Amino acid sequence: MPGRQRRDGGSGPAGQNGPNTGDNRGGGDRRGGGRDDRRGGQSAEKSNHIERVVTINRVSKVVKGGRRFSFTALVIVGDGNGLVGVGYGKAKEVPAAIQKGVEEARKSFFRVPMIGSTITHPVQGEAAAGVVMLRPASPGTGVIAGGAVRAVLECAGIHDILSKSLGSDNAINVVHATVAALKGLQRPEEVAARRGLALEDVAPAGMLRARAQAGSVK
């Protein structure tokens, strides 16, 4: 009987602490859920961008103790509406390298001048031994481009364009040559203002008609 009393006594004030501890743990879960909700909101904002991994390579570094292997990733990120960026990430694991590439691409965003679903004028870009030529195309043409060039154009939101890659077929050179070409695009208004001419004297009639149909230049 005394043993029973001791057991019953143990379920007294000390036993009441058990439910209180459970409530505190429940509160911790609620706080954690709040953080998850906030993180979910941030990931939802980032998910609006288009991400394309162009190439993943394994590289090695010779050190005193042997070789150290790591991975590199070339990533294109864009909003599909004229905004695009290129990033290059390096890490010991592939997911970490891709994430670093995405973060670098977001920091290098730039705006591509467009008329509707194509570019404003023919342009050529060069990077190292890579050369890429881009030409505007009529609606319905589609993206006539190879893998690396296509990734950049689709992330930028260009749906009708003609392209040709010359020189090196290295993906890094081709991507940077494509970016150089897109950065070389100019708006007709900028050219007319710099030359002191009217817009009709600078832009072809077909471009003006296409702009009128598609709206303002992005």
UniProtKB/Swiss-Prot annotation:
Task: List keywords of the entry alphabetically.
Answer: Ribonucleoprotein, Ribosomal protein, RNA-binding, rRNA-binding
**Which GO BP terms sit in this record?**
translation
Annotated region (Disordered) at 1-49
Looking at the keywords, is Ribosomal protein present? yes
**Which GO MF terms does the UniProt record name?**
rRNA binding; structural constituent of ribosome
- Report which superkingdom the organism of origin falls in: Bacteria
Query: What residues does the S5 DRBM domain cover?
Result: 49-112
Comp. bias (Basic and acidic residues): 26-49
Assigned GO CC terms: small ribosomal subunit
Under InterPro entries, the record lists:
Ribosomal_Su5_D2-typ_SF (IPR020568), Ribosomal_uS5 (IPR000851), Ribosomal_uS5_bac-type (IPR005712), Ribosomal_uS5_C (IPR005324), Ribosomal_uS5_N (IPR013810), Ribosomal_uS5_N_CS (IPR018192), Ribsml_uS5_D2-typ_fold_subgr (IPR014721)
Role of this protein: With S4 and S12 plays an important role in translational accuracy. Located at the back of the 30S subunit body where it stabilizes the conformation of the head with respect to the body.
Q: Per the entry's comment, what about the domains?
A: The N-terminal domain interacts with the head of the 30S subunit; the C-terminal domain interacts with the body and contacts protein S4. The interaction surface between S4 and S5 is involved in control of translational fidelity.
Its subunit composition reads:
Part of the 30S ribosomal subunit. Contacts proteins S4 and S8.
NCBIfam families under this entry? rpsE_bact
PANTHER family named among the record's database cross-references: MITOCHONDRIAL RIBOSOMAL PROTEIN S5 (PTHR48277:SF1)
The family annotation for this protein states: Belongs to the universal ribosomal protein uS5 family.
From the Swiss-Prot or TrEMBL record, give the protein name. Small ribosomal subunit protein uS5
Biological source species? Rhodococcus opacus (strain B4)
